């Protein structure tokens, strides 16, 4: 399988690169020119297309011939349409029938049936306000990006990550269609396993046109409430943790 990873230089992106290589996939990574050095340890095993992920021409070149596209849908910048521009470029240029898997947070809702805890809603509101004020984060643009994905006729999945932490793989996260399901109550997933779920979704047609909300398979809520429908698997092989990125990481991608 030939796979393009959009946003390959970030923490989540590097884990996805590692998982994809472990599966024997041919990997093309997209990242900003100034971030190419973060992929140095993969330089002899992947192809890199440097450039902004919301640059349509960059994405067109990167996804050509790819069977699957993994996208870190980050809401960076205000007024830049970074998330929606990235999503639109992928929707426009991915090969017909390609499997498209996008990452975002729990705050995205596919059908409006999610039930969010008060604390979560307050946190999102504060982070969204501070992010816009500092002109570094635009959650509204990420909402617009996912609206376009949901409305498209492509083979998409939008994976909604919980709060993330570093650490060895615990295995494939469990998932639910809606926030409020008790299986998600622990609100914690290893970042390496978020990446594992993204890569696994490429070949899991049960997730077509779904927006699974995930949680770590060894969390208390998952152990108490998981079923055969949202399944568990053994931990992945050891994956090296990416070098530490910026200290301020509000959405932990």
Which role fits each region the language model picked out?
Residues 190-229:
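Alpha-helical substrate-binding/gating segment
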Residues 69-109, 144:
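NAD(P)-cofactor binding segment of oxidoreductase domains
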Residues 82-83, 140-141, 185-199:
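Substrate-positioning beta->alpha
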Residues 110-114, 152, 166-175, 201-210:
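Glycine/proline-rich active-site loop of Rossmann-fold NAD(P)-dependent oxidoreductases
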Residues 146-167:
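Conserved beta-loop-beta element that borders a ligand/cofactor-binding pocket
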Residues 47-66:
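Conserved Rossmann-fold cofactor-binding substructure of NAD(P)-dependent oxidoreductases
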Residues 30-34, 52-53:
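N-terminal Rossmann-fold cofactor-binding loop
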Residues 3-23:
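N-terminal Rossmann NAD(P)H-binding glycine-rich loop of SDR-like oxidoreductase domains
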